[in-house]
């Protein structure tokens, strides 16, 4: 007998993308219609991403106002509007497994997108942008030139970039580091020493592509805070976690990255190290998406149980041995943006829990999607839609009237800060929560 949903913890089934039925056109179409019919009868998710308003409008405007009246080609705009944020699955849908309806909307969109990719229907530019390691190595090597050419103030070159590549000229693109965090770590790890008693804790920072190539300061802050708290720190970056490939439905490539990266990280796990991630999306991949794509790979399963988010890890220190003394007040309140891929990890709001240890800090939390969704927020075809989704979130942040905004997702933070600038809120850079901890420690 079926029972009302949202009463049990949601579970996710493995993504069996190699099964013949996964890309079977008839079975995929039938599953899309089944899912859409359930969504049509519920509509609890109407105020999330634009996939649902598009779906409901199409149904309401159809001949018989039902899913069966829709043509299969009408499904594509619904799929295209999904950013794989997972918020419908994690926070809204009452029919996710273990409910009998067994609905996982984001992974169904991923399945449909995989079928599109097989048919050559996905645009080529985002697929090339997903080659993070290749692209970013060039970006770091020629960082001054690339940062100048891609700057939003360089209107001539940005217009050319928009015409040729399709990247919206209005988007503030991430800047490249002049050196990778990996190189910084090798040169400076022994110089950063606070003579703190060792806590018998060992971690390896999985740097993540964004920190390694674009936001070194986050890695530096994490290194200093961990060392301040008596943690032995190592660093590893064998390659990107594969999230950009997941967004482009290149599942074999995600699996390839998972096997490559996990092999390196497991060597540290076998030596007693915990793996620490510095961005929410990468933590989600290592903890959840990799095990779903490779459910029979014992190494992947073992790695996932030894991965922690940096905020999660610092809170764990605080709850056990206690944090090192020296945290001081910071000059202004903090609005924490609890990013979608942090929420999808089901670990609570660890960024807020960590920042609570800053003396007398004013903390506010905004739990709403930024709308960026990887390349979704930068491409001309989808940038306006990303702004539509993110603008209410930026408005909430504005209304909190705090000096700092912190997010575990660097792209979400960048996107929201640009929306803030557009509404004359602030020109300050969005920070990772660990950077505020370093600031409080005066590191």
Q: Model features per residue range: what roles?
A:
Residues 16-40, 67-70:
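Asp/Glu-centered strand-loop micro-motifs enriched in Gly/Pro and often flanked by an aromatic residue
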Residues 27-31, 74, 256-257, 389:
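Short, glycine/acidic-rich beta->alpha junctions
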Residues 103-443:
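Iron-sulfur cluster-binding electron-transfer modules in prokaryotic oxidoreductases
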Residues 48, 58, 91-92, 235, ...:
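A generic structural-conservation signal
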Residues 27, 70-73, 100, 298, ...:
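A structural signal for alpha-helical segments
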Residues 33-52, 74-100, 112, 136-139, ...:
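Cysteine-centered iron-sulfur cluster-binding motifs in ferredoxin-type domains/subunits
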Residues 4-21, 47-83, 95-125, 425-436:
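Non-heme iron-sulfur electron-transfer modules
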